[in-house]
């Protein structure tokens, strides 16, 4: 049970750190952290939790990562559903805490997005469904390929969290304008269910695309990686 608790708290921290920075700090006039700050917040959230709970659960913090690790032969199917449930619940708990904080400011507007992921008119840059799909599939695929490589037996030990955190930062720098960056169904669900309406109606993409990308990334790594990994 400890590994499920670790995934709960790890995903809680990822959503609070990443989405919290987007909701509370990104748009502050003059002192706002902007896209770069949000990207760093997501990367740092994963990096810190990877060191904290990696030895307990592997610090997946993401249903797509869990699926990808299973496809890559690094994770048992029997633990897949409990991990995903723990991740989603942790994300939702963080979304609730973030809502309590954000709603304490006068003029707070939940309908403005609450760091939700979207496409079309709900894309930060007005990108289409097709662009959002390609972005999420490709970037999640590369994320999994790097995760599998960085955690392989041949990789330098102790550096995987840094590689993974920096990768997630780069992914956000690329795709915040496209979809607000998901690559993580739990992160998307964590805020979409509070916004409701369009955020929920578009949520399907941010489950389908990251999981598809994770599967493709894991299969790609199996082609180039060591079979004994």
UniProtKB/Swiss-Prot annotation:
A motif (NPA 2) lies at residues 184-186. The record marks 42, 172, 181, 187 as: Selectivity filter. It is found in: Cell inner membrane. A motif (NPA 1) lies at residues 62-64. One of its GO terms (cellular component) is plasma membrane. The record marks 19 as: Involved in tetramerization or stability of the tetramer. It comes from Pseudomonas aeruginosa (strain ATCC 15692 / DSM 22644 / CIP 104116 / JCM 14847 / LMG 12228 / 1C / PRS 101 / PAO1). It is a multi-pass membrane protein. Homotetramer. InterPro entries: Aquaporin-like, Aquaporin_transptr, Aquaporin_Z, MIP, MIP_CS. It catalyses: H2O(in) = H2O(out). Channel that permits osmotically driven movement of water in both directions. It is involved in the osmoregulation and in the maintenance of cell turgor during volume expansion in rapidly growing cells. It mediates rapid entry or exit of water in response to abrupt changes in osmolarity. The keyword Lipid metabolism does not apply. The gene is aqpZ. It comes from the Bacteria. One of its GO terms (biological process) is water transport. The chain crosses the membrane at residues 8-28, 33-53, 81-101, 131-151, 158-178, 199-219. The keyword rRNA processing does not apply. SUPFAM superfamilies: Aquaporin-like. NCBIfam families: MIP, PRK05420.1. Pfam families: MIP. One of its GO terms (molecular function) is water channel activity. Aquaporins contain two tandem repeats each containing three membrane-spanning domains and a pore-forming loop with the signature motif Asn-Pro-Ala (NPA). This is Aquaporin Z. Keywords: Cell inner membrane, Cell membrane, Membrane, Repeat, Transmembrane, Transmembrane helix, Transport.
């Amino acid at each position: 049970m400890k590994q499920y608790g670790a995934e709960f708290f790890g995903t809680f921290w990822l959503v609070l750190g990443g989405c919290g920075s987007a909701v509370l700090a990104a748009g502050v006039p003059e002192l706002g952290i902007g896209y770069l700050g949000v990207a760093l917040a997501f990367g740092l959230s994963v990096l810190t939790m990877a060191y904290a709970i990696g030895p307990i659960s592997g610090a997946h913090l993401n249903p797509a990562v869990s699926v990808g690790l299973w496809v890559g032969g690094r994770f048992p199917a029997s633990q897949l559903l409990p991990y995903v449930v723990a991740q989603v619940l942790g994300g939702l708990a963080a979304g609730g805490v973030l809502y309590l904080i954000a709603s304490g400011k006068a003029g707070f507007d939940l309908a403005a997005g609450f760091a939700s992921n979207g496409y079309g008119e709900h894309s930060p840059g007005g990108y289409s469904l097709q662009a959002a799909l390609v972005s999420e599939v490709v970037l999640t695929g590369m994320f999994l390929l790097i995760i599998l490589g960085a955690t392989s037996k041949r990789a330098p030990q102790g550096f995987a969290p840094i590689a993974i955190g920096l990768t997630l930062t780069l992914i956000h720098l690329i795709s915040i304008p496209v979809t607000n960056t998901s690559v993580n169904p739990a992160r998307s669900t964590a805020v979409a269910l509070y916004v409701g309406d369009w955020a929920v109606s578009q949520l399907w993409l941010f489950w389908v695309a990251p999981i598809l990308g994770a599967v493709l990334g894991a299969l790609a790594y199996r082609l180039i990686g060591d079979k004994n990994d």
